Every structure is written in structure tokens, then in C-alpha cells.
Amino acid sequence: MVNRLKKSSVSIIAVLLILILMAIPTGYEDAAIYKGTERVRAKVLSTDESTVKSSGLIQSGEQYCKLEILDGKFKGQETDGVNMLSGSLESDKMFETGDIAQVVISHSGDEILSVMMSDHFRLDKELLLAAMFVVLLVLFAGKTGLRAVYSFVITVLTIWKIMVPAYLGGVNPIWCGILITAFLTVLIIFLVYGFDRKTAAASSGALLGVLMTCIIGCIFTDLFKIHGAVMAYSESLLYAGYQDLNLTQIFMSGIFIGASGAMMDLAVDITSAVNEVIEKKPDISWREAARSGMNVGRAAMGTMTTTLLLAYSGGYIALLMTFMAQGTPIDNILNYKYVSAEILDTIVGSFGLVTVAPFTALTSGILLTGKKKREASVQKEIAAE
């Protein structure tokens, strides 16, 4: 009965926190560039490519589309839209009859001034994919899967509602990142274990690993002379009125934030293993329990570091292909600042994984054996009475 109450209270806390985070304004909802505009869905009725110029793979000019507005105050109206082509495969898109597009309507009162084709509408597919993921997770993992969904949503909301506005507001990215990571680490592990010493043990180990990653990351970012502008889209912030942002510190914070998930995973694995050992052998010493945790950590570290490597390098396959196609020498590749930044990300994140194993084994051994011994002494006192 007590365990059920604890588990239900964990879910209630998670739901309340989600509602609170959703209610928090970012402060950037009413951006000036979106005033007098409306972003809605529109169905493409026909297209006109007469002014589109093609040169190999590149297209430039304007594609004109006949549209039916599907949302907003102009719903049901037919109008013309313009799709501007800049000659960039990355940002350009072409529409076909029957496509559902996201468009930006500039208007004055009830009069449409212009309609710009923003992109293909994908939100419905994104929601479908997310719903499939949630259903599959809950189906296979039950209540644990539901708590995982809670932690996922809370993480997304915390980053979007708190961390990003704080960074834009000029808050020190490293200290803010540490606090946000600490909050998410404790909360996510709490959703796994609930009110238990295992939460304290796993959280302590993971946070010590995050702190170590932060220190090493800051030192070597400076030694590597990496500027934060290596992050995608970061330089555009400087030209959008945020000249005072410290992009390098934001890059530093991204190193330990990115690795914190893997560290939490390893900390939970080790804590669960140590707890299982103590359950089977209640009289075990904390040193033996910690040693067992280290054995589990050694087995997991090999795959976890490779996981980080694959996660970070996956987005740079095209860059590596370009280097190979050009016959770039390996020393030039490794010295290239974008590659150096990824090497820094991967190795420093792996440092965190290597350190989180002994930290968690130690905290789990001390905290969980202490709990078991207290329970044993209480049972002896009850039996004696």
C-alpha cells in the first residue's frame, strides 16, 4: 500500500511539474518579426514554375502556387503564394499540387497582403511518430515507460522554457547548464526509483561525473582554442541583436549537457546492480558492494563510450565523405576545428562516463548497505521485543 502511494505520488509530481513548465512564458512569444502575420496550413491547388531557373541541381527564382487556406481567420479562402528559391539545396523546397504547406500570411485587418510559402507541413507526421513511440514504450514498459515519457516531456520543456531563455538573457551558460543538468538528473532518476536511497546514490554518482566533465571540458575547450561559433546557427544569433552572448561558454555547457544522459543511464545501471547484490547478500560490506558496482561499470563503459562516438559522429557523415572525396590528409582532418570540436565532445563525454562508474559504485555501496543494515537492526529489535 505504501509503495503504491509512493509511486502514485511520483506520477502526480511529474504531471504537476509538466503543467507548471507549460504555463511558464519564455518571454519571446511576441517577437516583433511575427506581428501582423499568421502562420497557417494551406493546400496547394496548382503551381507555376515559369520563372524558376534550373542549373544542374540548383534552382533559383520564384515558384507561384494557388492555395486554399486551411486554418486561421482566412480559412477557406483561395489566394496566391510565392515560394522563393535561393539556389540552396539545404533550404529550398518545391511544392506539388495536393501538398499541404505551412505558409506565412501578411495581412492588414481582413485583407491579405502577401503569402510566403514557408515549408512543407510536417507537424501531423511528427505527432504521429511521437504517439507511436509513446504507445510502444508504454506497451512494453508499462508504468515505467509512462514515467519515461514524463521525464522526456519534462526535459524538453525545461530546456525550451528555462534554459534557452536564460541563455538568451545573458545568464552564465556554464553555471546555468550545471543547475539545469543537476535538476534534470535528480528528477529523472527520481521518476525511476521514487522516494528511495537509490535515487540519492545514482544522482550523486551522475552529478559527480557531470561536474568532472564540466571541468575537463572547460579546460580543453580553452586549450583547443575552439570558438562557440562552430555550433550550427550560433553565429546568426550575434547578427540578430545578441552580440553579448558568450558562444564559447554555451559550447562548453553543451559538452556536459550532451553527455549527461549517458551518465544517468550508467549511474542507474550500476545502482540497480549494487542494490540487487545487497538484496541477495544483506550482510555484504560497502567495499564489496562498491567492487561489484565497478565490475558492472567496466562492462558497460565500453559500449557507452562507443554510443557517444556514434551519436556525435552520425551528424558529420557528409563532412567526412567530403574530406575523403577531396583526399584531405588525416592530420588536416583531425586539426579542422569542426572535427576538433566533435573530438572534444566525444572524448570529454567519455571521461564523464569513465568517472561516473567509480563515483556511483562508491555512493551506492555506502548508501545502500547502510540502508540494509538499518533495516536489519530494526527487524532484530522487533524480534527481540
Identify the residue ranges that each predicted region occupies.
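Alpha-helical transmembrane segments and their helix-start/interface "positive-inside/aromatic belt" motifs
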Residues: 4-12, 197-210, 301-307
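Pore-lining and gate-forming transmembrane alpha-helices of multi-pass membrane transport proteins
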Residues: 205-210, 240-257, 303, 307, ...
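Transmembrane alpha-helical segments that form the functional core of multipass membrane systems
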Residues: 131-138, 143-238, 245-258
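Hydrophobic alpha-helical transmembrane segments of membrane transport and translocation systems
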Residues: 295, 299-302, 311-385
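Structural detector for short beta-strands of small beta-barrel domains
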Residues: 36-61, 101
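Extended, hydrophilic extramembrane loops/domains of integral membrane proteins
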Residues: 87-125
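Helical hairpin unit composed of two closely spaced alpha helices linked by a short loop
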Residues: 260-320, 327
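Hydrophobic secretory-pathway targeting helix
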Residues: 1-37
